[in-house]
Swiss-Prot record:
EC number from the UniProt entry: 2.1.1.182
Keyword list, A-Z: Cytoplasm, Methyltransferase, RNA-binding, rRNA processing, S-adenosyl-L-methionine, Transferase
Family: Belongs to the class I-like SAM-binding methyltransferase superfamily. rRNA adenine N(6)-methyltransferase family. RsmA subfamily.
GO molecular function, one term: RNA binding
SUPFAM superfamilies noted in UniProt: S-adenosyl-L-methionine-dependent methyltransferases (SSF53335)
Protein's name in the database: Ribosomal RNA small subunit methyltransferase A
PROSITE patterns, A to Z: RRNA_A_DIMETH (PS01131), SAM_RNA_A_N6_MT (PS51689)
Superkingdom as given in the UniProt entry: Bacteria
Binding site residues for S-adenosyl-L-methionine: 18, 20, 45, 66, 91, 113
Location within or outside the cell: Cytoplasm
Pfam families, per the entry: RrnaAD (PF00398)
Lineage: Bacteria, Pseudomonadati, Pseudomonadota, Gammaproteobacteria, Enterobacterales
Organism: Salmonella schwarzengrund (strain CVM19633)
Length: 273
């Protein structure tokens, strides 16, 4: 039997489809999410409804975003979930989560078993809507979860770590083996909870500046910041901020990146685009 077929649906590689089918894992994820009636629950990539069904059982309404036309059609005709669902058959990368929150009248609780081929860009898309989001629970490649939670002075620490922790508290929830999916992915998976900060611990004046600094630093992560960020900061400026110019990108904390961004915003602000 083709191990890419599950419940009569052929998993599509171009959509990064791996369908969750382990009942213990599913129950553990639903318990971690703890959905309640009246909340604005939004699922990204419901697939064959492994999470949609147990979450939907606890709710009166559930919004789902599914790119695959065939899977969206299956959900529309689902025997008991259908009437509860509002289905957006579109790419989550094009979704305006701010508008959706306004429509639903409250911050969103977002969850999903995310396609691994788009998980990182989708994270950055969601970070831009954290004002409209209460929390997020995602199944991701374990390596991506490691990067989300990583602290300075580790190989996993990178731009994703800094930006995720700038916007959210990041909490690992559960590790998941390949055997929990059909077809089994070639990598281990993990569930992570992201809770947007109610008050930013390190506010920045212009998020575009933080994005630029982290991009330039981590694109040249083996260089010292005196070299990788030499076009933005002098050695004297870094020293005045208490940041050692001999450090590399992975040695600098989220707080220090935010400090650098605010210095640049005040002294060399980006032009409005």
């Amino acid at each position: 039997m083709n191990n890419r077929v599950h419940q009569g649906h052929l998993a599509r590689k171009r959509f990064g489809q791996n369908f969750l089918n382990d009942r213990f894992v599913i129950d553990s994820i639903v318990s971690a999410i703890n959905p309640q009636k009246g909340q604005a629950m939004v699922e990204i990539g419901p697939g064959l409804a492994a999470l949609t069904e147990p979450v939907g059982e606890r709710l009166d309404k559930l919004t789902v975003i599914e790119l695959d036309r065939d899977l969206a059609a299956r959900l529309q005709t689902h025997p008991f979930l259908g009437p509860k669902l509002t289905i957006y058959q579109q790419d989550a990368m094009t979704m305006n989560f701010g508008e959706l929150s306004t429509q639903l009248g409250q911050p969103l609780r977002v969850f999903g078993n995310l396609p691994y081929n788009i998980s990182t860009p989708l994270m950055f898309h969601l970070f831009s809507y954290t004002d409209a989001i209460a929390d997020m629970h995602f199944m991701l490649q374990k390596e991506v979860v490691n990067r989300l939670v990583a602290g300075p002075n580790s190989k996993a620490y990178g731009r994703l770590s800094v930006m995720a922790q700038y916007y959210c508290q990041v909490i690992p929830v559960l590790e998941v083996p390949p055997s929990a999916f059909t077809p089994p992915p070639k990598v281990d998976s993990a569930v992570v909870r992201l809770v947007p900060h109610a008050t930013m611990p390190y506010p920045v004046k212009d998020i575009r500046v933080l994005s630029r600094i982290t991009t330039e630093a981590f694109n040249q992560r083996r260089k010292t910041i005196r070299n990788s960020l030499g076009n933005l900061f002098s050695v004297e400026t870094l020293t005045e901020m208490g940041i050692d110019p001999a450090m590399r990108a992975e040695n600098i904390s989220v707080a220090q990146y935010c400090q650098m961004a605010n210095y640049l915003s005040e002294n060399a602000p980006l032009k409005e685009s």
